[in-house]
Amino acid sequence: MTSPSSRSVRPGSVVRTVRRHRGGRSATVQDMVAAEMPVAFIYNGVPFAVMMATPEDLEDFALGFSLSEGIVDHAQDLRVIAVETFLEGASLQIEIPPERAAALDQRRRNLDGRSGCGVCGNESIEAVLRVPPVLHSSLQIDVDALAHALDALHARQPIAAQTGAVHAAAWADAQGNVQLVREDVGRHNALDKLIGALARARIDASHGFAVVTSRASYEMAMKAAQARIPLLAAISAPTALAISLAESAGLTLIGFARDHDCVVYSHPQRLDLGVAVGEPA
C-alpha cells in the first residue's frame, strides 16, 4: 500500500499519525485527513461571514458564494483583492460596488463554526424562502449522459480519494462530459466553488447540469437555481422544501442518481429516460 508520504498532499489534505485496526491487527501509520479551517469573507473591509471550509479554490469560493447568496448579480461586479492564508485560517478580501456593500449591512452576521451555509445573513423567513427568477431552459439530457457524468465525477475527486471526508460538485455539458469539479468539507461550499469556477471560466451554466455527492437540501436547490443551472442531480435524497423550490423556480431536481437509476422530482421534461412512461413494476 502506498504511504501518505509518497503521495501528493494537496492543500485540502493533511497528514496525521493514527492508530489503525484492521483484520485483527493494529499499527501506527501515517494517514491523510481532510483539511478544514475558518474562512472569513470580508467585503469592502468589513467582515460579513466566517465559513468552515477546505482551503482550496478559495477565489472560486469567494465568487460563487457572492453570486449564489445574491450579494452580487454578475461576476464583473466583484473583485477578489487578496486571499490571505494563516496558520489558523484564511481571509478573502473582496471588493463590491458601494450600493451592494450597503445592502450587506442589513444581512450582516457572523456564521463561525458552520461547514457551509445556504441562507447566510437573512433575518426573516421571507428572505430565506425567496424564489429566484424562473429558469427557462431548453436543456435536455438523456439518462446515459447523467450516468456518464456520475461515473466521471467518481474518478475526479482527489481529496475524497485521499481522505473520504469531503463532498464534490461537478458541472457537465449536455452530453455528460464533466468540465469542472470542486470539493469541500461542506456540500454548500463545494457547490459555491463550482458556481464561482463556472463564472470565472465564463461558461454558461444553463447549457449543462450539476451533479453533487450529497443530499439536495433547499439551500442546494436555491444555489443551483440562482446560478441558472437548469438541472441538479444529487446522489442522495432531496428535502420536501427543495422540491417545492425546484417546482417554483423551474429547476429539474433529481435524487438517488446512481449509474442509470434516479428519481426525478420536478420538471422531468429535461431528462429523456429513453423508455415509455408507465406505472412502476
Curated annotation (Swiss-Prot):
It is found in: Cytoplasm. The active site is at 117 (cysteine persulfide intermediate). SUPFAM superfamilies: Cytidine deaminase-like (SSF53927). Coiled coil: none annotated. Its main location: cytoplasm. GO terms for biological process: Mo-molybdopterin cofactor biosynthetic process. It holds the Pfam family FdhD-NarQ. GO terms for cellular component: cytoplasm. Keywords: Cytoplasm, Molybdenum cofactor biosynthesis. GO terms for molecular function: sulfur carrier activity; sulfurtransferase activity. InterPro entries: Cytidine_deaminase-like, FdhD. HAMAP family: FdhD. Required for formate dehydrogenase (FDH) activity. Acts as a sulfur carrier protein that transfers sulfur from IscS to the molybdenum cofactor prior to its insertion into FDH. Belongs to the FdhD family. This is Sulfur carrier protein FdhD. It comes from Xanthomonas euvesicatoria pv. vesicatoria (strain 85-10). The lineage of its organism: Bacteria, Pseudomonadati, Pseudomonadota, Gammaproteobacteria, Lysobacterales. The gene is fdhD.
